[in-house]
Structures are given as C-alpha cells and as structure tokens.
Amino acid sequence: MRGIRKGHALALRVGTPAKINLWLEIVRKREDGYHDLSSLMLPVAVYDHVEVAWSHEGGVRLSCDSAEVPDDRGNLAWRAADAYLEAAGVTRGVSIRLEKNIPVGAGMGGGSSDAAAVLLALNRLSENPLSEAVLHRLAVGLGADVPFFLHCVPALATGIGERLLPVHGIPDYPLLLVKPPISVSTGWVYGSLKLTRGESRIKLRSFLDRPWHLSEVLRNDLETVTLNEYPQLGQIKCWLMENGAVGSLMSGSGPTVFGVFAEQRLADGAGELARRVWKDCRVDVTRVLGTPVSARS
C-alpha cells in the first residue's frame, strides 16, 4: 500500500491480487440458501490497482478504465466504501479509481479483492480506524471471498468462506492461467449445483505433508456445472496436463482454468505455446504468493 499526494489530499494506491482455489468442496446447502464449503484459497500474482482518497464531495465516486465494470452500487468496491462510511460514521466522500487487470467474471476474485483493498485503504486513511473484527464483519457482508483478501495469505476457508485458517508451508507454485472469452455467473453456478458431499474429504494435514501430490487434492465441485455448460474448459484442462502441468483445475465458479507446474521455466514455455494454441483466451504465467507483504505491495 503506497501513499501518493493529489493536490493537498493523500491517496493510497494498492495492488490487489487475484486468487485460485486449490480445492473447492461444497459440503452442504444451508437453510438460508448459502452453501457451506471447504476451500484452500491461494493469492496469485495477477493484480488490479485501486487508488482511494477522501473527497470533499459527499458519497462515493468511482471510475474505472474498463467498460466491463460498473461505476455505481453495482460495483463491489463502491459498496465497500459505502459500508465503511456508514460503519465509521464518516461524512466525507470517497474517490476510487480502479485499474482492472484481473479478468471480470473469471473465478479469480477480482471484485472481492478490490472491495477488500478499499476497506483497508479507508481504514489506513481514517483518523479513527475500525477494528479488525469490524472490518471482517463488513467484508463478510459484502461477499464470501472478501474476508480472504483482507489478509491475502494462503488460507483454508470454511463456512460460506468467512472462517479462515492461515496455512503455512504452501509452495510458490508456478502457474499458467487460461481464461476463455466468457464470463460465468457465480449465482447461476451455485443455483445449478446438484452435488453436495455432506462433509469435507480432503485433509489439510495430509496435503501439507505432500504439497506436490496434487492429484490427491485438486477438486472443484463446481466443475460439474461449469464444464458441462462450457466443454472448452475441460479441453483446456487436458491440454495443460499434456503440456507439462502436474495438476490442473478450474478456479472458483470459472471459467479460468489453471495449471500448476514443477518449475517456472516449464510454466513459461507452456505459456508461450498456449498463446498460440488458445488464441481467443487470456493467458497469464504467474505464481502463488506466500506472504502478505508480496501480496499487498
């Protein structure tokens, strides 16, 4: 988080990382309509940038360099600022500038990451910052993925995603991300889901003992919906495995598919080939982030 001067006002500029789900198990559907889950969430070095400053004008003003992103209450970052102002009793306005690089509707948490960044930036700018517990409550109210991005460290998410257990010892996996030119509605995917497990089957301790034995943990119950609707995603998964990945999975509700590689040079080489083979897709070669310092630089 970096402070910059704009006239007499101090603005904060924040790099907001994406995420992948190394596994995503849907445990049960709750009476309130939400789903309990178990997921290992990992921050990834693909970033949006968010600039936040107090404004003399009331309310929230948001601008973005992408036409895909709304500039009003339809934007999660806008709602994050509005929620913070109400919780903190602040009467000043907020100005937000988004620079989008994380694909929209990709299953990579871009909107949630931006929202968490706004909460953190406003708390840093505030003369009377809110407690961590209040920030967490605000984040939960905004969306299930937002609490994860308050800390941006590998974490086991349970409940609807609001209960987070930081996980140490995760390798900085080299990654190749491939996103077809489609967007997927998370609400549609969950609404179409039929499978529920009843309990989590993946054991965190066993995974940490053998973090490169990915075939034992790469599971995403939402694939049963998204891959059925978009067969290309299954083709990309197979292609990644045929071209050097040690594991491949759809992230979140999709449509982004990631491949995990044993070495960065192998991911780089596969990335060059992917750009030629999957010409209509967004391709990123990146890695998992292991510390909050690197994730929030």
From Swiss-Prot:
A GO term, aspect molecular function: 4-(cytidine 5'-diphospho)-2-C-methyl-D-erythritol kinase activity
Catalytic activity: 4-CDP-2-C-methyl-D-erythritol + ATP = 4-CDP-2-C-methyl-D-erythritol 2-phosphate + ADP + H(+)
Pathway in which this enzyme or protein is active: Isoprenoid biosynthesis; isopentenyl diphosphate biosynthesis via DXP pathway; isopentenyl diphosphate from 1-deoxy-D-xylulose 5-phosphate: step 3/6
Keyword Nucleotide-binding: yes
Alphabetized InterPro entries for the sequence: GHMP_kinase_C_dom (IPR013750), GHMP_kinase_C_sf (IPR036554), GHMP_kinase_N_dom (IPR006204), IspE (IPR004424), Ribosomal_Su5_D2-typ_SF (IPR020568), Ribsml_uS5_D2-typ_fold_subgr (IPR014721)
UniProt: ATP binding residues: P103, V104, G105, A106, G107, M108, G109, G110, G111, S112, S113
Catalytic residue list: K19, D145
Enzyme Commission code(s) on record: 2.7.1.148
Keyword terms, alphabetized: ATP-binding, Isoprene biosynthesis, Kinase, Nucleotide-binding, Transferase
Similarity section: Belongs to the GHMP kinase family. IspE subfamily.
Role summary: Catalyzes the phosphorylation of the position 2 hydroxy group of 4-diphosphocytidyl-2C-methyl-D-erythritol.
Annotated protein name in UniProt: 4-diphosphocytidyl-2-C-methyl-D-erythritol kinase
Lineage: Bacteria, Pseudomonadati, Thermodesulfobacteriota, Syntrophobacteria, Syntrophobacterales
